[in-house]
Design a protein with these regions (language model features):
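Active-site metal-binding motif and surrounding structural segment of the metallo-beta-lactamase
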Residues: 1-34, 121-127
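Core dinuclear metal-dependent hydrolase active-site scaffold
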Residues: 1-2, 20, 55-121, 197-229
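Cap/insert and terminal regions of metallo-dependent hydrolase folds
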Residues: 5, 31, 37-40, 100, ...
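Alpha-helix capping/helix-boundary segments
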Residues: 14, 38-39, 59
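Metal-dependent catalytic neighborhoods of phosphoester/phosphodiester hydrolases
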Residues: 18-27, 170-179, 204-205
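Short, electropositive alpha-helical surface patch
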Residues: 28, 177-188, 211-226
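Helix-loop-beta element that forms the nucleotide-linked donor phosphate-binding surface
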Residues: 42-56
């Protein structure tokens, strides 16, 4: 990896905060931005204090020509049996002179999206979770129809669905979030970008991207008729 100006963290769950990854990134990263308490974990892992900034909801910082604001999310935190909700979780607003971006982190659908939209929107691109959803935990992860509504609440121009295709945290198929959000987006006239993991996109002019998950050689997708070869 090249030198990295900053790393944004949303909360301390293992699928979002990996100790080995953080330690490997330290030599490359100028600044880690984290919600309250999460930065303390980085310090405990040996990250130099000068590289860590912790923010409460609605606090902002200027770095590298950007203004970054920690904004509310509806989720929870903790890494063990006895440390539940001792650290904060958040979403992020990222603003430059030309662009406004929103990163949801993990969140259930709540009226905070509309408030963030009123304060900071409209957004050129919203990066919103759609994945790991289930009817039994609607307050901490969004279903695709809620992701679409959050995008509209925020005043988003392009939607980039995140929190999918990696860790298997729910009962749905790994590719289902992509299919469902694209179906809903087509129905409601919402522009969606689905870059393959590791693929770059031009934030000034996002592209829809191909349905790459249908090309993955995987027994699960082949059963559903999406597999290749």
């Amino acid at each position: 990896l090249p030198p990295i100006r900053g790393v944004i963290l949303s909360h301390d769950h293992y699928d979002h905060l990996d100790r080995a990854a953080i330690k490997a990134l330290v030599p490359l990263v100028e600044l880690f931005l984290a919600p309250l308490g999460v930065g303390d974990r980085l310090l405990a892992w040996g990250v130099p204090p000068g590289k860590v900034r912790q923010l409460d909801w609605w606090q902002d910082i200027e770095a590298g020509g950007l203004r970054l604001t920690a904004t509310p999310a509806q989720h929870f935190s903790g890494r063990g049996l006895h440390d539940g909700n001792r650290t904060l979780w958040c979403s992020w607003v990222i603003e430059s002179a030309e662009l406004k971006l929103f990163f949801s982190g993990d969140s259930g659908y709540f009226d905070g999206f509309a408030e963030i939209g009123r304060r900071y929107g409209p957004f050129d691109l919203t990066m919103l979770e759609t994945g790991a959803y289930n009817e039994h935990w609607p307050y901490v992860h969004m279903h695709p129809q809620q992701t679409l509504q959050a995008h509209r609440d925020l005043g988003g121009r392009w939607l980039l669905p995140i929190h999918n295709g990696t860790f298997d945290l729910a009962m749905h198929a790994w590719y289902e979030p992509f299919e469902r959000i694209l179906e809903l987006a087509t129905e409601h006239g919402v522009r969606v970008s689905t870059p393959m993991m590791g693929e770059r996109i031009d934030l000034q002019a996002p592209h829809a991207g191909r349905r790459w998950w249908r090309e993955v050689v995987d027994s699960e997708t082949q059963v559903q008729g999406y597999g290749c070869c």
